[in-house]
Amino acid sequence: MNSGVLLSESETDTSETSERQSGLLSAQGSIKGKLEEFSAKLDRLRLDDENSEEEHALKSQSVSVNSEGNISRSASASASASASASAKLRNSQSPVQEYTSDTNPETDASFRVKIRLRPIGSIPQIQPRVCQISSHQNFSALVKFLCKRLKRNHVHCYINNAFAPSLNQTIGDLWSQFKTNDELIVSYCETVAFG
């Protein structure tokens, strides 16, 4: 009777051992699958070839799963892999950080745009020829300024002698699209100059 109990305990021990081994095998398969998936993701994320030595070290290192289900890597290989991953992360983030940290004068509310005023025809020249206006103001503010300065009821204005912008368009948008030597060239006249 005693041997029967011992036999059943040994049977449970072997069944537990076989369950552990099958669990380890499935864990090894899932770990191996995860490692392959991670490797494929890293291959897709390769952004530049500057770190080719680090990438070569990452490819040449061997990752093994031992019988206990633990992942073993040499310490230097894991350090080089983490250094490579952090370098890639820094390289991929740096253009975004530089772009967002740069101040864009066109979006700055206090940015002032230089405007060069050129007369067309017999209309008098305004002195000084270059003035500054806030970039968030509409083009109508410039037209009103010219009307007051020239003492006229109406003035026709053109950008780069090419087109008449709408009065509600912002000066900053016009400057960013049509600037010449960081100045917006505005031609003005009494009558319609360009049909």
From Swiss-Prot:
Gene name, per UniProt, is ATG12
Segments for region (Disordered) = 1-29, 46-71, 86-105
Which InterPro entries has this protein been placed in? Atg12, Ubiquitin-like_domsf
Q: Where is there biased composition of kind Basic and acidic residues?
A: 46-58
- Cross-link Glycyl lysine isopeptide (Gly-Lys) (interchain with K-145 in ATG5), where in sequence: G195
- Record note on disruption phenotype: Impairs the formation of preautophagosomal structures.
Citing just one GO molecular function, the answer is: Atg8-family ligase activity
Q: Protein name, please?
A: Ubiquitin-like protein ATG12
Q: Which organism is it from?
A: Kluyveromyces marxianus (strain DMKU3-1042 / BCC 29191 / NBRC 104275) (Yeast)
Instruction: Give the source's domain of life in one word.
Output: Eukaryota
Q: Which family does it belong to?
A: Belongs to the ATG12 family.
Q: One GO cellular component from the entry?
A: autophagosome membrane
Pfam name, any one: APG12
The further comment given in this record reads: Kluyveromyces marxianus proteins are shorter in length and have a more ordered secondary structure than their S.cerevisiae counterparts, which might contribute to the superior thermotolerance and solubility. K.marxianus could be therefore useful as a new model organism for further elucidation of the molecular details of autophagy.
Polar residues compositional bias: what residue ranges?
Answer: 20-29, 59-71, 89-105
